Structures are given as structure tokens and as C-alpha cells.
């Protein structure tokens, strides 16, 4: 049996960062989803309702790669009350030739955080206006910070508005984001205030009730919705999704049962026969992305095993 490589979060942080290379790798993974025979089973989820927790298992095999990943990703959303992070996890890296375990990545959720933020940047690169300079962050956790970091690698962001349910946490995030003086950062008292006159909105919360409503949809707006990765989560009102000029999924087979599209279909706001695009199809040139500056677009990101393997 070959030796198994064991890497800690510190090891991984020293060699993998949220940069343009990471964004390009995730972009390639999306393109492969649209053009190659990717093997990606549905997400396995275990709910632990008495502790406000869930565990997701994701995997995918991308043709041509020597290895594939299986990720175990717990999310226990009462953990901050205990002084613990909401998210953690690990990945197993297996040989695509033999199936033997090559490496165990004890990333504590770091790799998931990086690839999730990188996916948001890919969505913005293909669907937001190139001259987008302002963003609303709906959510004030670590993923909101990383989403902004990734977004700034693909768009010339100057103004940031932040809304979160925890006002103290939101204020602390805003202080941190504005510390170097490169950004104009404002903590907002409401989603309405945060959504006023912005080019991009990023929702990254575990909300079970819609936060984005039809009156928030301004011409030219792009929304990246990150939070609805389970049936009970919902950040975008079905009536708002129905008013979009362009809805894009990371994987339609997932967003029809887990994402924002799931809620719109269930509410009857969107037809079951409506034709939608996947992000990989746009990257591969199979479907159009943003066509006109005034379009309102949304990318529904539920997270894919292809991103983890990439």
C-alpha cells in the first residue's frame, strides 16, 4: 500500500490561496461539467435538526484528472454561540486509476471556502457588467469576506454595502474591510438599504426566508446567490426570480431540488418547461451570458463536487 499524505489546514493554507489561478481552476471545472462526461452523483445530505446542523457529502470525477475528491462538509449553525465556526470539513483524495486513498486533507472547511468564493467570482466574470463598481454583501460571515476578495480580482469594486442579522458582527466586518482605505464600506440596517444603487449583490446566508424581493431588482443588477444549498434554505423570493432576465445555475439538476429555482418552481412562479442555462454552458460558449447592460441576472450556486475535485 502506498503512503497516504496527510495535510492539515495550515499546510493547505500555505500552498492554496484565493487568487486568479484558483478562479481559473473553478471556471475550468464548470466548463467540463458542460462539455465532458463528468461523473457527479447527487449531493448526500444528513440533517441533525436538534442541533441546527447538517452534513453534506459531495464528489465528482472529471475525465483526464489523475485523482478525484470526496468531501464531507458539516454545517452546524448554532456553533458561534459556543465560540466555534459554523462550517468545517475534510476531503479524501483518491486515485482515479486504482481507487486507493492518496491523501487526506484536513482543511477544516478552508478548501470549500476558497472554491465557493472562486465560484462567485466566476459567476461575476461571466454575468455581471464589466464596469461594476459597487456590491451589496447580504451576510456578514467569513464567506462574505471571501466573496468580496474574489470579486475584486475580476471587477473594479470601489463601494461595498453590508447587511447581516448580527449588527455587531456586521460592523466589525465593515471596519475590517475598510481598514486599508481602498474601499468605501457601509454597514446597512436593512436589506433594502444595502440593495439600493448597487451593481452586484451577493447573498451568503443560511436564511430560510427570502431576503431579495422583486423591488430590489434594478436594471443592470447581477445577483450571485450562494446560500440555498438545501431544500429549506431560501434567499431569493420566487416572485423576484420570475422577474429575472437571465437565470443561471451551477447545475440545473441540483437547483431544481435544492436551490432558489426549486422554490420558484414549487411556488408556480416559474414554469417547469422554462429553459435555463448552466454556468458551464456559458463559459464553454454553448449558451449566452449577459447580452445587454440593463439585464438583471442571477447565478444560483448550490456547490458541486466538480469544484471540490478541481
Walk through the language-model features, giving the residues of each.
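Rossmann-like adenosine-cofactor binding region
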Residues: 182-264, 269
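NAD(P)-binding Rossmann-fold cofactor-contacting core
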Residues: 153-180
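Short helix-loop-beta connector
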Residues: 127-134, 156, 218-219
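Adenosine-phosphate binding glycine-rich loop
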Residues: 11-13, 232-310
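Conserved beta-strand elements of the Class I
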Residues: 135-136, 297
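N-terminal Rossmann-fold NAD(P) dinucleotide-binding loop
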Residues: 144-145
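Glycine-rich Rossmann-fold phosphate-binding loop(s) that bind the pyrophosphate
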Residues: 140-141
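N-terminal ligand-binding/catalytic initiation module
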Residues: 1-113, 119-121, 128-131, 277
Amino acid at each position: 500500500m502506498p503512503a497516504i499524505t496527510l495535510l492539515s489546514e495550515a499546510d493547505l493554507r500555505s500552498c492554496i490561496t484565493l487568487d486568479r489561478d484558483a478562479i481559473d481552476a473553478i471556471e475550468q471545472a464548470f466548463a467540463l461539467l458542460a462539455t465532458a462526461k463528468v461523473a457527479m452523483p447527487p449531493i448526500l445530505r444528513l440533517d441533525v435538526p436538534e442541533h441546527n446542523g447538517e452534513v453534506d457529502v459531495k464528489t465528482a470525477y472529471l475525465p483526464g484528472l489523475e485523482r478525484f475528491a470526496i468531501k464531507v462538509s458539516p454545517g452546524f449553525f448554532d456553533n458561534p454561540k459556543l465560540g466555534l465556526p459554523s462550517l468545517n470539513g475534510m476531503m479524501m483524495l483518491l486515485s482515479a486509476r486504482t481507487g486507493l486513498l492518496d491523501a487526506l486533507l484536513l482543511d477544516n472547511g478552508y478548501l470549500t471556502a476558497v472554491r465557493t468564493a472562486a465560484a462567485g467570482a466566476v459567476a461575476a466574470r461571466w454575468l455581471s457588467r464589466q464596469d461594476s463598481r459597487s456590491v451589496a454583501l447580504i451576510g456578514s460571515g467569513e464567506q462574505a469576506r471571501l466573496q468580496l476578495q474574489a470579486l475584486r480580482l475580476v471587477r473594479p469594486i470601489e463601494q461595498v454595502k453590508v447587511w447581516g442579522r448580527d449588527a455587531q458582527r456586521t460592523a466589525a466586518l465593515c471596519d475590517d474591510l475598510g481598514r486599508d482605505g481602498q474601499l468605501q464600506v457601509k454597514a446597512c440596517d436593512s436589506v433594502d438599504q444595502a440593495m439600493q444603487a448597487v451593481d452586484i449583490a451577493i447573498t451568503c446566508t443560511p436564511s430560510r426566508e427570502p431576503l431579495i424581493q422583486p423591488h430590489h431588482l434594478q436594471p443592470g443588477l447581477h445577483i450571485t446567490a450562494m446560500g440555498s444549498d438545501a431544500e429549506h434554505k431560501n434567499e431569493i423570493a420566487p416572485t423576484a426570480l420570475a422577474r429575472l432576465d437571465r437565470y443561471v445555475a451551477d447545475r440545473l439538476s441540483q437547483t431544481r431540488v435544492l436551490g432558489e429555482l426549486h422554490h420558484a418552481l414549487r411556488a408556480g412562479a416559474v414554469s417547469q418547461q422554462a429553459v435555463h442555462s448552466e454556468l458551464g454552458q456559458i463559459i464553454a460558449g454553448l449558451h449566452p451570458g449577459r447580452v445587454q447592460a440593463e439585464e438583471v441576472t442571477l447565478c444560483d450556486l448550490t456547490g458541486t463536487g466538480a469544484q471540490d475535485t478541481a
